[in-house]
């Protein structure tokens, strides 16, 4: 039982650490002056992907 708790706590820690590292990366690249357009493009691409995925999933449900 304690091993599972440790694993869960460690996973949460690593998720938080990765999120903090990602935010730091975004902040540092934005300071360099070229992240905004790249970030917007990536978000748009991701948004389009999820819209398409939802559409395909809705077709599969019929």
Curated annotation (Swiss-Prot):
It comes from the Eukaryota. The keyword Secreted applies. InterPro entries: Glucagon, Glucagon_GIP_secretin_VIP. It is found in: Secreted. Pfam families: Hormone_2. One of its GO terms (molecular function) is hormone activity. One of its GO terms (cellular component) is extracellular region. Induction: Produced in the A cells of the islets of Langerhans in response to a drop in blood sugar concentration. Keywords: Hormone, Secreted. Belongs to the glucagon family. Promotes hydrolysis of glycogen and lipids, and raises the blood sugar level. This is Glucagon. It comes from Scyliorhinus canicula.
């Amino acid at each position: 039982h304690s091993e599972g708790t440790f694993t869960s706590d460690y996973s949460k820690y690593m998720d938080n650490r990765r999120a903090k590292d990602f935010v730091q990366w975004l902040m540092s690249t934005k300071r360099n002056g070229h992240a905004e357009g790249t970030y917007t493009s990536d978000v748009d691409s991701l948004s389009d992907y999820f819209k398409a995925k939802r559409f395909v999933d809705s077709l599969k449900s019929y």
